[in-house]
Amino acid sequence: MALKNFNPITPSLRELVQVDKTSLWKGRPLKSLTKGISKTGGRNNQGRITSWHRGGGHKKLYRIIDFKRNKIDVSAIVERIEYDPNRTAFIALIKYEDGEYSYILAPQKLSVGDRVISSQDADIKIGNCLPLKCIPIGTTLHNVEMKVGKGGQIARSAGTSVDLVGKDSGYAQIKLRSGEFRLVPLDCKATIGSISNPDQKNINLGKAGRNRWLGWRPHVRGVAMNPVDHPHGGGEGKTSGGRHPVTPWGFPTKGKKTRKNKRTSKFIVKKRK
């Protein structure tokens, strides 16, 4: 997919850079594979903000994606590649030989008419899903499971992938884009290839309103708040906050490590860079 620039006939078009979606399906999604999705405005079931700066945005239909690829040894043909407003990657509508339809994450270079399959004996081909024990070392993968049968969790956003770098003692070692090396059980499944839409990282929204369409509200600085709202708030005139940057709850921000999960740390061979 190429990037699209615009003639600056308005100020917001001057900086706007979008992904060219002319090759994607222009119709509506398959109704049987969609469901309604309600907005939370960043609030939890108590009505308290748990995700700041969320709210508004265009209405969406949720596309039900098959992350598990549990239809084993049944070949499917790619009917079309679609845009999905719920994720940065594109999705592919596939039709199995028995007539069933399904949405999967579309990898790069997957085209309409291609055949994909989930099988232990599948070819090492873009879009095919296999257990890690059946995949040769050095293969580029996406939608990798962390627990057997749970469905893919690693490398699902636009342009991402992981590399299979080793196998030992019932575990596969994968290298993530962050530089982290991680162990995953060999019976976990993964899909061949890297995720579509790698140009997503190069887009420029061009104006604040386009961010609002995506459901993001303005990000307010702590120093612009009152003392009741933030540790950096208050002061006479403009102030610098008066302390090292912290979150609204007083914990250090700006890169302090917060991960505390000893139970799964044993699966991290090398920490991210």
UniProtKB/Swiss-Prot annotation:
Keyword match Nuclease: no
Xref: Pfam families: Ribosomal_L2, Ribosomal_L2_C
HAMAP family named among the record's database cross-references: Ribosomal_uL2_B (MF_01320_B)
GO BP term, pick one: translation
Gene that encodes it: rplB
UniProt cross-references to SUPFAM superfamilies, sorted A to Z: Nucleic acid-binding proteins, Translation proteins SH3-like domain
Molecular function GO labels: rRNA binding; structural constituent of ribosome; transferase activity
PROSITE patterns membership: RIBOSOMAL_L2
GO cellular component, one term: large ribosomal subunit
Source species, domain of life: Bacteria
Biased composition (Basic residues): 254-273
Protein family: Belongs to the universal ribosomal protein uL2 family.
Function recorded in the entry: One of the primary rRNA binding proteins. Required for association of the 30S and 50S subunits to form the 70S ribosome, for tRNA binding and peptide bond formation. It has been suggested to have peptidyltransferase activity; this is somewhat controversial. Makes several contacts with the 16S rRNA in the 70S ribosome.
Upper classification of the organism: Bacteria, Pseudomonadati, Pseudomonadota, Alphaproteobacteria, Rickettsiales
SMART domains noted in UniProt: Ribosomal_L2 (SM01383), Ribosomal_L2_C (SM01382)
Span list, region Disordered: 228-273
Subunit structure: Part of the 50S ribosomal subunit. Forms a bridge to the 30S subunit in the 70S ribosome.
Name listed for the protein in its UniProt record: Large ribosomal subunit protein uL2
